Amino acid sequence: MKRVIVIGIFILLACSGCNALKKTWNAMTGKDLSGTAQQLAWTGMDAYEDGEYKDAIDYFQQLKDWYPFSKYAILAELKIADSHYHLKDYEEAIFAYEEFEKLHPRNEAVPYVIYQIGRCYFDQIGTIDRDQMPAHMAYETFQRLEKQFPNDKYARSGSEHLTTCVRSIVGSEYNVGVFYFKSKHYKAALHRFMTVLSDYPDVGYHQKALEYIARCEAELSPEERAEVN
């Protein structure tokens, strides 16, 4: 079983491309670390690989609490965040990932960590009639990842989600405009449709926004139209 766990950890390190975590892996095979810390790491990985994420969090948290300066601790920090993500405890996962980035800003796992923060927000995107905060936050996070690490594979993965974020945001903006129009709040509606047109021209709402802009302008005086423009 321990061999299976070690293989799982090796796969994790290979996928992350993280030198610091690889050093952790090297340390795990050495003699300088506490057997108890090592056992917590192995048991935590065993639980994680088996999908027992709550148990994994418990083991890794014990490792952090009892051996905060252990070379295992960095692995525990990351797997706590990953476990929360798999449990869909997105708020806790975001906090853990952000703490990792803050504590280890030069760690090579940071692109993965930023990507996971974006995924936490992205996975909460609902229908266009719901709060668009997750879409906005996912978009901003993936944009930050692309800017900071333009050549990283996680930046490329994040960029693939940007269109979905934008479509959710613009769909909500358009729907609010339609609501205002039907409520005869034409100036407010016009403002929404103008925003769709100017800020999001290429995501499928261009023609529909133009049609509503014409209908709103027909209901407004020149002075009212000028206020919006």
Q: Where is each model-derived feature located?
A:
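Alpha-helical linker/edge segments of TPR/alpha-solenoid repeat scaffolds
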Residues: 86-91, 119-131, 164-179, 215-229
